[in-house]
Each structure stands twice: as C-alpha cells, then as structure tokens.
C-alpha cells in the first residue's frame, strides 16, 4: 500500500504477518498508521492498494478488509476530508472515495 499525503509525501506499508494470528496487520493500516505518526498534521490525499502472488501482480483488484475500512473512516474524521482509494489489479484499477467503502462505520460518541 502507498499513502499520498497532501504535501506530496508518499508513505509505504506492507503486510506484517505474525504466527500468532490475528496479530499481523494489513498494508493499508501499516501505511496509514505510519503516516499519522510521522506526519500528524498532513491530510491523506490518496491510498493505493496492490498485491502480488508468487512475484506477479494479482489480476483482480485488491479490496481492503473491514478493519482497514474502519481506519480509513477515522482518518476522514480526523482531517475532515475524504480521499481516493485506488484498488489496483493487473487488468484494471478501481478508484473510489474512502467514505463509500464503509458507509456505517463505528464512531466514538463518548
């Protein structure tokens, strides 16, 4: 995954696997969390997601899991702006707004 920030910085992330499943983390969250830690005041402009299998790009587009979608919803709330998500496959790329991936996200109301 790659996060493009509003200032032009690109932050990369990859899957972090762990034998103590489900302790690993998806590439999307790795990149978004790193961007939030390293550039806390810079909004996200876009997030690109791609995957390979045995060194080759997947033919199908890659869609984020529910946990990643929730994190995206919280990034939108944090900065007050939506961002593009590019789901990349070998044969096509789908571009969609992050807000449309999880229309009924959890929200802290405490």
Regions from the PLM with identified roles:
Residues 1-5:
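Short beta-strand scaffold segments in enzyme catalytic cores
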Residues 9-10:
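Hydrophobic "anchor" residues
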Residues 14-22, 54-59:
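A short glycine/serine-rich beta->alpha loop
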Residues 18-37:
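A short mixed-secondary-structure module that forms the rim of ligand-binding clefts
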Residues 39-110:
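C-terminal binding/interaction regions
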């Amino acid at each position: 995954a790659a996060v493009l920030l509003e200032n032009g910085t690109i932050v990369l992330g990859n899957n972090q696997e762990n034998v103590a499943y489900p302790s690993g983390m998806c590439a999307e969250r790795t990149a978004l969390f790193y961007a939030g830690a390293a550039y806390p005041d810079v909004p996200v402009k876009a997030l690109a997601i791609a995957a390979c299998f045995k060194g080759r790009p997947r033919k199908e587009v890659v869609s984020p899991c529910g946990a990643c979608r929730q994190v995206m919803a919280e990034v939108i709330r944090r900065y007050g702006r939506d961002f593009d998500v590019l789901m990349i496959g070998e044969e096509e790329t789908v571009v969609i707004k992050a807000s449309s991936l999880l229309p009924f996200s959890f929200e802290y109301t405490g």
